[in-house]
Amino acid sequence: MYRIAIEKLLKWKQSKRRKHLIIEGARQVGKTWLMKEFGKQAYTETIYINFDSNSRMAELFASDLDTDRLIMGLELYAGHKIDPDNSLLIFDEVQEVPRALASLKYFYENTPQYHIVCAGSLLGIALHQGTSFPVGKVDFLKLYPLSFKEFLIATDKERFAELLDKQDFGMITCFKQTYIDSLKQYYFIGGMPEAVQSFAENKDFNEVREIQKHILAAYEQDFSKHAPNEIVPRLRRVWNSIPSQLAKENKKFIYGLVRDGARAKDYETAIMWLSDCGLVHKISRVNAAGIPLRANEDLKAFKLFVVDVGLLGCMAGLRQRTLLDGNALFVEFKGALTEQYVCQQLKTIEDLEVYYYTNDRGSCEVDFVVDTGEQIVPVEVKAEVNLRAKSLKTYQEKFSPEVSIRTSMSDYKKEEWLVNLPLYAIDQLKVVTDA
């Protein structure tokens, strides 16, 4: 299975300013596989340590963090001397041993020649809870579920993925039905590696759904196992409310949908926990369009999306036939899935900050507004071929962005102020807007 993140890891290896690396991401997005695959491709040997199951290595880090002593212990574990240039050290589930995380500071300061990559299913929570590790002494990489482009490659449509990267929209339009059919499959399957691998091998949607159910069950088990006891019920309520939150026309998160009488102060910690472990994307509102967008962020108003579009469909009990064949009643939630999909793809674009816009009266809403670092780009999402963009036009007249994006099932089309970018090509947003 091809992951674009491999290319980032190869660049990391060659960087003269390389620091030891922490990979963040939700459970089961493929962090362990990625690290091991990187080791196979780029190193003579890989030394893999899982701190959740290897008590001996946990004990190694329990006393002092002298790096010479630690390297000796790692060499004894490996059974030979470690070659810094040709060996990859993998610390998996590193949040289970906070001192192993803290040791990265000393490895960086005293033995930077070694190549160390770390990951953990709940590492985001450990980092935000104050586990000691040196900010500025490590590099970070965020891993998400497979993007739509990676899904195309995994399902033997690599040439179609290459065509997207070339932005040959004339050729893309000729084969748009292939893209649309694959996009519908992606809405159901999503990008969780196990689900994609299963579909690529067996083409069995029922098997995919069972895998998704198991992943969701594992997430719920994490709530009980790792979250503070007092917030576990609130975690479940927030998590289970997301499909109904997104099914609304106005997808702003409403606490009253979680529980009658619910207030922000009762659920803020639960939402932060879900966000820290990578299970949700919290997209905040902005009410202006200045650079940087973060300066206009309204922290009290936000949308919550889950980590994966396939998991959202599973949570909502969406049937394969409804999604792939269509249904007259399948209208509102199609919009939810489409917006979830777009959010998920935008999150995979490097150096892109994602928000949404409403004016203070609430009479104008733009589904997403992104900060590319160079410009602010409004993005209107349409589930089908609907080309009406009233709110986008209002935003354009008020803020005059260089370009506005409407993404839909319609073909690519560039107008004076507006670009219609097909949903299956939304990952090309930065390239298209910079052109």
Question: Each predicted region: which residue ranges?
Answer:
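N-terminal pre-Walker A segment at the start of P-loop NTPase domains
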Residues: 1-14
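Hydrophobic anchor at the beta1->P-loop junction of P-loop NTPases
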Residues: 23
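Conserved lysine of the Walker
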Residues: 31
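Hydrophobic positions on the alpha1 helix immediately C-terminal to the Walker A/P-loop
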Residues: 34, 38
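Short glycine-rich substrate-engagement loop in P-loop NTPases that contacts/grips substrate
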Residues: 53-85
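Interdomain motor-coupling "hinge/lid" segment immediately C-terminal to the ATP-binding subdomain
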Residues: 128-247
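Conserved catalytic cores of phosphodiester-cleaving nucleases, focusing on short active-site segments
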Residues: 346, 366-385
